[in-house]
């Protein structure tokens, strides 16, 4: 364990010295923390974790904390953390308004990702921080600018003779081409001030470079053209430095994939596995030298390219802020990086800070690991049409998992099961028509291609290495798994599986189901489980303590392994187990982490010991100090049951982690686990589409006409009766996976096959799709079938857009009192019919039939939904806390309360955040399968105001200003496009169309003095970009009636071009109308504010507390 870099001055003042008083930065009583905004690809839940840690650290030191973050789903915007929360856009303008109102003494910029950092730089350049006397805490802005500006960065590293890739900073396409010709192809292009490699990529010639730079420079003011080092090893070091120069390296990590794939899309191992001692210390020394020379104060990430067969290395980049890698390093080592960085920002030095894990060592001890951590990314590219599935220097993954084991094989296999529960471990797939190509040109299925080559196609380690450039060490480790798999396959019968072989397989990370499947199709995982237990083969529980057990630890940060001889902990507390959400993916994100964290907090408040199981390094729920016992483990039946039995748990909460815990509820229940809340038998009656619809019919509750889909011939009989369009829905899926709206017979067969494939063990239901219906969400909590509390949110979009992609308004603005009463009755009837105890969510459509309003139930999930944080925070009532009291029962159960009967003088709107910019080729068209990756929300005095503020919190939006161009197109058979144009025309925008037919259509809606300029449809991407630039297009409205069937579809090309060139896109009629109304209402004030030197703070810039009228507790 190393204490290198500690000065004499600092080490004399260790935190244990009696009477010692740290020399903190003076005059800092209140601190503004900049959040990262809505989750997106490249900037996800890791900033909720780091921001929450920072707030804890500041409050512990007695500082008043003010947070600005529109992401209402986060833990950091919870009741119990910051003193003041502003649900406002993270932009320089809104941050300025908050600074004027709150007058903070200090500001933290490095806990809000790239968004927060960019805002800080903009505020400094505008003179705002100096004007209001706000001190930047931690790393100075000049240092942040140096690390973000590629030219300044290169110059700084050359000052200390640190090797970097030869590079040239460019601000035009022609400059980039000239630079590449000087450097020599292949080159990599990197964008300045960009997140997750956005706008970066490789180019082998001038044509590729021009196409890449055209897009990159639309997203960033500067690009760096540098010599490609594709194929070198990629190594990362997490470094911490305090104000007096003490430095430690907290963790070093090695990418399984060679350089060329963004680290966020790479499999990562910690600690590094293939470095020699010389290489390790060479890079460690360089990292410390870099961070000292730059002057970073706090946490920093240094990325290297290392020559595979020599000691040459190049510095790729430095992130002088908390990042995705720092969250991983923090969870991998147990060292609280964000907490420590926040303390350092206040002026503490490393020797003055205790290690909160051991409580007996100081923070300047470098962590030591006696285990291996594997991080594997999760992609959801299959949800998108026409998307480019190759992976490279621009990040595309939506989440990641972290697995812990005592050897590579154990951690590696765990990680793959965590990424996708349908997988058994390291395995192949027969999907690759050209396996060599799949290995050489990586996609999101890369590791399956490696598994197929080694496990099923007989490729040698050398051949796979030549095609992939993956280090031979890793491939030989994979071969250990392959050999065990082959050995198991030869057995043929469980009777031939002896104790020695079974134990060896478990030590290599094989799960029970994987072993059963290898031996015989007739075996189940329960067969292997019974045999394993009869042999006494049980996993051991080990502790992560940052010190490799050299120093006793007081926390319970745990993992499970078969590579041990004893447990590190004792059992018998009979705690309540809470299952987390697992990997972030489209449909399951930070919302469920909020639910899980609030569950354990509510349980602890009632005096119960808590056990959390989760494996997501980006989450607050996997923070060591949130629960009594944290297991960084799989959410599989096998692992959950192992822990449940070892801990002698008194109960298990499966309804707060989204769909994944729900999917194993029945297995846990059948094996004797005490499931708190609704019985899994009743849950199954809601998850199974056939059972659900049958019960609704029995109760006489209205729903769209439906039938169980068993064969295409039966479907056609149903269609003869109800007609198109219809909705096809599988059971037990999340975020509308494989759900489709079918408009014609040509699409039906493919949709049918996809739905059956995604949920083969459960029925698929087909129902009549009712066009033009309004969709409503009900979030509720019940106790033994009686409704306790509910909230009704309105969708802005009509039914047909997944609820996770919908814009929600709460309280509802267009519902009549009798409709709200009927909705409450429906919720109460469902709660009673399914005997619900705990959370549930319903989706209902409102439609007119025969002159009457009809409310039809379309779905019910007996678990917390992704809108639980939204309704809890908007209404000021914690739905999760009420659900926990329902779980516990007795006198704790609160009386029923009708929140929808109350009067509210504010409205909140939640908007989805998409990451189409990150997904080249993906059609940004909304449908019944979810596509958004995050959300933002805002409060206002009315729905229009709250929507206008929320909209500005989206990364993809900037306010279009007249006389800029707005390009209009799409479905001309309905009036939506014309009504939008009529609202926009009076404000001086230049209205553009790409056909005479569109122009003629629009003329019917526009006043005589308005005109539409008709442009010719561009044929190439370069021509589209030229058109956008020439006509200053700042907004695209494309209301196509259907998703594009082909990439040559004109509407698709325009939608995709808007995304590629960072132009706001509106493509859903109701949302577009709301946008047009909001722009008409607030544009005059926006223009006036932009022209004013000291604009007045808008009335909607208020803290959450003032909207509610009380401070939530």
Curated annotation (Swiss-Prot):
One of its GO terms (molecular function) is ATP binding. Residues 957-1113 form the MGS-like domain. Residues 956-1097 are annotated as: Allosteric domain. Its EC number is 6.3.4.16, 6.3.5.5. It catalyses: hydrogencarbonate + L-glutamine + 2 ATP + H2O = carbamoyl phosphate + L-glutamate + 2 ADP + phosphate + 2 H(+). Mg(2+) 1 binds at residues 303, 317. GO terms for cellular component: carbamoyl-phosphate synthase complex; cytoplasm. Residues 23-420 are annotated as: Carboxyphosphate synthetic domain. Mn(2+) 3 binds at residues 843, 859. Mn(2+) 2 binds at residues 317, 319. One of its GO terms (biological process) is L-arginine biosynthetic process. Mg(2+) 4 binds at residues 859, 861. It comes from the Eukaryota. Pfam families: CPSase_L_D2, CPSase_L_D3. Keywords: Amino-acid biosynthesis, Arginine biosynthesis, ATP-binding, Cytoplasm, Ligase, Manganese, Metal-binding, Nucleotide-binding, Repeat. Its main location: cytoplasm. ATP 1 binds at residues 150, 190, 196-197, 227, 229, 234, 260-262, 303, 317. Residues 421-568 are annotated as: Oligomerization domain. ATP 2 binds at residues 729, 768, 770, 775, 800-803, 843, 859. It is found in: Cytoplasm. Heterodimer composed of 2 chains; the small (or glutamine) chain promotes the hydrolysis of glutamine to ammonia, which is used by the large (or ammonia) chain to synthesize carbamoyl phosphate. This is Carbamoyl phosphate synthase arginine-specific large chain. It comes from Eremothecium gossypii (strain ATCC 10895 / CBS 109.51 / FGSC 9923 / NRRL Y-1056). The lineage of its organism: Eukaryota, Fungi, Dikarya, Ascomycota, Saccharomycotina. The gene is CPA2.
């Amino acid at each position: 364990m190393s204490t290198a870099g500690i000065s004499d001055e600092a080490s004399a003042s260790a935190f244990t010295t009696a009477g010692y008083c740290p020399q903190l930065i003076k005059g800092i009583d209140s601190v503004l923390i900049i959040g990262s905004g809505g989750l997106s690809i490249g900037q996800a839940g890791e900033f909720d974790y780091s921001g929450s840690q920072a707030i804890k650290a500041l409050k512990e030191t007695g500082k008043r904390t003010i947070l600005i973050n529109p992401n209402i789903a986060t833990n950091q915007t919870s009741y119990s953390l910051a003193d003041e929360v502003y649900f406002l856009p993270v932009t320089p303008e809104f941050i300025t308004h908050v600074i004027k109102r709150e007058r903070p003494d200090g500001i933290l910029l490095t806990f809000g990702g790239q968004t927060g950092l960019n805002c800080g730089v903009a505020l400094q350049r505008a003179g705002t921080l100096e004007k209001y006397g706000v001190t930047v805490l931690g790393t100075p802005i000049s240092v942040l600018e140096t690390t973000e500006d590629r030219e300044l960065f290169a110059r700084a590293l050359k000052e200390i003779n640190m090797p970097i890739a030869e590079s040239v900073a460019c601000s035009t396409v022609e400059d980039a081409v000239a630079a590449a010709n000087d450097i020599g192809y292949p080159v990599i292009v990197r964008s300045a001030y960009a997140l997750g490699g956005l706008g970066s990529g490789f180019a082998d010639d001038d044509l590729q470079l021009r196409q890449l730079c055209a897009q990159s420079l639309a997203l960033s003011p500067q690009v760096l053209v540098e010599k490609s080092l594709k194929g070198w090893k990629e190594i990362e070091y997490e470094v911490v430095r305090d104000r007096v120069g003490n430095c430690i390296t907290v963790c070093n990590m090695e990418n399984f994939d060679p350089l060329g794939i963004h680290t966020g899309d790479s499999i990562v191992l910690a600690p590094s596995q293939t470095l020699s001692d010389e290489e390790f210390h060479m890079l460690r020394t360089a990292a410390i030298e870099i961070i000292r020379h730059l002057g970073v104060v706090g946490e920093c990430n240094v990325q290297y390219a290392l020559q595979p067969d020599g000691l040459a290395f190049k510095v790729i980049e430095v992130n002088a802020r908390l990042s995705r890698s720092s969250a991983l390093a923090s969870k991998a080592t147990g060292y609280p990086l964000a907490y420590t960085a926040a303390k350092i920002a206040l002026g503490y030095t490393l020797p003055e800070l205790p290690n909160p894990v051991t409580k007996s060592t100081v923070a300047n001890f470098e962590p030591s690991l006696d285990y291996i951590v594997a991080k594997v990314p999760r992609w959801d590219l299959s949800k998108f049409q026409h998307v480019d599935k190759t992976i490279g220097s621009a990040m595309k993954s939506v989440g990641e998992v972290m697995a812990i084991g005592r050897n590579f094989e154990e951690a590696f296999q765990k990680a793959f099961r965590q990424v996708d529960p349908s997988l058994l471990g390291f395995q192949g797939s027969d999907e690759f028509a050209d396996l060599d190509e799949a290995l050489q040109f990586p996609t999101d299925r890369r590791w399956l291609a490696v598994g197929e080559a080694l496990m099923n196609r007989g490729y040698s380690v050398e051949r796979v290495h030549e095609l992939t450039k993956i280090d031979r060490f890793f491939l030989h480790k994979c071969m250990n798994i392959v050999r065990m798999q082959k050995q198991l396959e030869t057995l043929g019968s469980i009777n031939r599986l002896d104790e020695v072989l079974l134990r060896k397989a478990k030590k290599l990370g094989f799960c029970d189901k994987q072993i059963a499947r290898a031996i015989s199709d007739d075996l189940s995982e329960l067969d292997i489980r019974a045999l394993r237990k009869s042999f006494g083969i049980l996993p051991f529980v080990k502790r992560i303590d940052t010190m490799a057990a050299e120093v006793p630890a007081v926390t319970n940060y745990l993992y499970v392994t078969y590579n041990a001889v004893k447990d590190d902990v004792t059992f018998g507390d009979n705690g309540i187990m809470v299952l987390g959400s697992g990997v972030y993916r489209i449909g399951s994100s930070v919302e469920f982490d909020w639910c899980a964290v609030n569950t354990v907090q509510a349980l602890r408040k009632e005096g119960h010991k808590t056990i959390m199981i989760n494996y997501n390094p980006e989450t607050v729920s996997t923070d060591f100090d949130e629960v009594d016992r944290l297991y960084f483990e799989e959410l599989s039946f096998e692992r959950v049951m192992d822990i449940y039995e070892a801990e002698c748990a008194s109960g298990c909460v499966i309804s707060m982690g989204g769909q994944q815990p729900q999917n194993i509820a029945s297995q846990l229940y059948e094996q004797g686990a005490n499931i708190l809340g609704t019985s899994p038998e009743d849950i199954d009656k809601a998850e199974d589409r056939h059972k659900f619809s049958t019960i609704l019919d029995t109760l006489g509750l209205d729903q769209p006409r439906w039938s169980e889909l068993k064969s295409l011939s039966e479907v056609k009989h149903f269609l003869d009766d109800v007609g198109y369009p219809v909705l096809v829905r599988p059971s037990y899926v999340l975020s509308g996976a494989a759900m489709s709206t079918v408009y014609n017979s040509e699409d039906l067969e493919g949709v049918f096959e996809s739905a059956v494939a995604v949920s083969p063990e459960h029925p698929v239901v087909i129902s009549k799709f009712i066009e033009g219906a309004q969709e409503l969400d009900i979030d509720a909590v019940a106790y033994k079938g009686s409704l306790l509390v509910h909230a009704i949110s309105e969708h802005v979009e009509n039914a047909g857009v997944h609820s996770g992609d919908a814009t929600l308004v709460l309280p509802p603005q267009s519902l009549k009192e009798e409709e709200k009463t009927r909705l409450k009755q429906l919720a109460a009837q469902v709660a009673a019919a399914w005997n619900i105890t705990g959370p549930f969510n319903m989706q209902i459509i409102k439609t007119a039939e025969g002159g009457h309003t009809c409310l039809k139930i379309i779905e019910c999930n007996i678990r917390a939904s992704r809108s639980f944080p939204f309704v809890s925070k908007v209404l000021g009532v914690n739905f999760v806390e009420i659900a926990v009291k329902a779980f516990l029962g007795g006198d704790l159960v609160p009386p029923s309360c009708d929140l929808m009967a109350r009067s509210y003088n504010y409205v909140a709107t939640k908007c989805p955040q998409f990451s189409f910019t990150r997904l080249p080729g993906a059609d940004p068209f909304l449908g019944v399968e979810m596509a958004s990756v995050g959300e933002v929300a805002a409060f206002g005095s009315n729905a229009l105001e709250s929507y206008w503020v929320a909209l500005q919190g989206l990364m993809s939006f900037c306010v279009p200003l007249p006389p800029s161009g707005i390009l209009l197109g799409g479905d001309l058979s309905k009036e939506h496009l014309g009504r939008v144009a009529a609202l926009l025309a009076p404000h001086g925008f230049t209205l553009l169309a790409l056909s005479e037919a569109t122009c003629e259509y629009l003329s019917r809606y526009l006043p005589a003095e308005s005109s539409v300029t008709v442009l010719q449809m561009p044929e190439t991407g370069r021509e589209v970009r030229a058109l956008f630039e020439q006509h200053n297009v700042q907004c695209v409205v494309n209301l196509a009636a259907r998703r594009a069937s082909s990439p040559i579809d004109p509407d698709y090309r325009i939608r995709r071009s808007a995304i590629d060139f960072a132009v706001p896109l509106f493509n859903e009629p109701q949302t577009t109308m709301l946008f047009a109304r909001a722009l008409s209402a607030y544009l005059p004030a926006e223009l006036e504010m932009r022209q004013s030197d000291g604009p007045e703070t808008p009335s909607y810039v208020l803290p959450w507390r003032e909207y509610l009228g009380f401070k939530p507790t």
